[in-house]
Amino acid sequence: MFLLLPLLESNNKLIDTLSSISEQKNIHQENIEVLIVDATDKTSGKIANGNMSMCKVIYAKSVKSFADACNLAASKATGKYITVCNCGDTFSDNYFESCIKVFNKKEKIPFVAGHRFCVNPVFREKKEFRLNKGQLESSVVNLFDNPNLINLELTGTFYRTEIFKSYKMNNKLKYESADDFALRIQLDYPEYVYLDEIEFDYFMPVSDDFMYYVPTNYKDWYTDSLNNFLKPLINDSKDRDGNIPLFIQFYIVFNITTKFLANMNNRNKRNMNDEELAVFLKQQENVLSLQMTVLFLTKTSMFLSATARKPPRCSI
């Protein structure tokens, strides 16, 4: 069991994360290795070394991004299973054991995901992740059957190490390197297991919530990411006939919707002048024109205006 923990800035929440790891049921600590990539002033790494023998620290002040930290740590990963978490993230005490049971039972499953909540004090109570799956008829999710059940968040998702290490995060993507990494794995492995009985609590808001974008005063996120991230993802996802998987189409709409969601916050309004806004609107129109199916997203569901042709299902 291998955990990657990037430290890009000093954070006093590290001990919370390490405590939740040490409290896992029926998992011996000698079977867990936590690799911390510390790009800070070494304070956080010292906290880890002083508290738990399962922690190893790489001091890498040259690391500037989440993608760089993950790539560095992944190159040194050992063990059968791997996940990533940030300072302040915690796991329910049955998380590791439940994931391992799935991997042992279903040998072809590439990764396991669970229920997610944001526990940042900016919210009055734990806030449920919008893309939580809830109670499903089957814990095995096939994205060709259920394209709205994409798994976007890299943190808290347990992968088979050999699969995780066969991909590399794109450190040229300033904002969506984790989404790109997760989706490219799902293009090759469209089935995974979702467990509603395990819980991952993350400290920092993520892309389903407008708080993630406060303050998102970076114009390149509105424009450059469409060209540098979404368009290459779309082109790489096409099959021989030029068809785009429906779950990638779902993500396209989700991604563009979040940009409008972010702009609902007063800090982001008037971030672009009229000419810049016109460029963004034209770019998102060009991206959406690549869609083969019209998707309408609501807070709780997805509606399709047409049924896309499904490729053969690969059963596990």
Which residues does each predicted region cover?
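Cell-envelope/extracellular polymer assembly enzymes that use nucleotide-activated donors
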Residues: M1-L4, E33, D180
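Short, well-formed alpha-helical segments that are part of the catalytic scaffolds
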Residues: S10-K25
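Acidic donor-binding segment of Leloir-type glycosyltransferases
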Residues: I21-Y59
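Glycine-rich, basic loop-to-helix element that forms the pyrophosphate-binding segment
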Residues: A60-A77
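Short aromatic/hydrophobic "clamp" motif used to bind/position activated sugar donors
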Residues: I82
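Conserved donor NDP-sugar-binding/catalytic core segment of glycosyltransferases
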Residues: T90, N94-F129
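Short, flexible, basic/aromatic active-site loop/helix in glycosyltransferases
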Residues: K127-L149
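A short, conserved alpha-helix in the catalytic core of glycosyltransferases
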Residues: I163, Y167, L173-I198, M204
